[in-house]
Amino acid sequence: TGVKWDTAERTQKLLGMMSEANRKKVREAQKAGRRMVGGVYKRTRLDEEGNKVQRAEVRFDDIAGCLRTPSGGSSRQSILVVEGRKIRSRLLSPREAARLMGLPDSYRLPPNYNDAYHIAGDGVAVPVVRHLAEHIFEPLLQHAQRTEAAA
């Protein structure tokens, strides 16, 4: 699957970048009694003194954050897997990013992580475009064509 788990030290560093509110989400996931999988993004936030600091923000609601093109470490989404006291982290794989964007597994991705991730980042999900086309754009176009023909 092309996934490589982070070291325990790297996972601890990621957890250390979290605000108290996000660390609370992790503690709640630990108490859930089942495996919890969350998406983690690094964001620049202001601290109490107004200084910009990099923060890790986690969500466990089965919603993936916006996939951004990789220009630096902050644009790469990580996965956090919590099973009781055991917490592991890793980058979202390029194949997982492609799946989130609606690309089939048969779609050939470049071997380089950034090149492959770039295909999915800052894109529009194929299923979303298909839905918009079928339910909004095409009906509007057909209506406009009928209106124009009747005029």
Residue ranges of predicted features:
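S-adenosyl-L-methionine-dependent DNA methyltransferase catalytic core
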Residues: 1-151
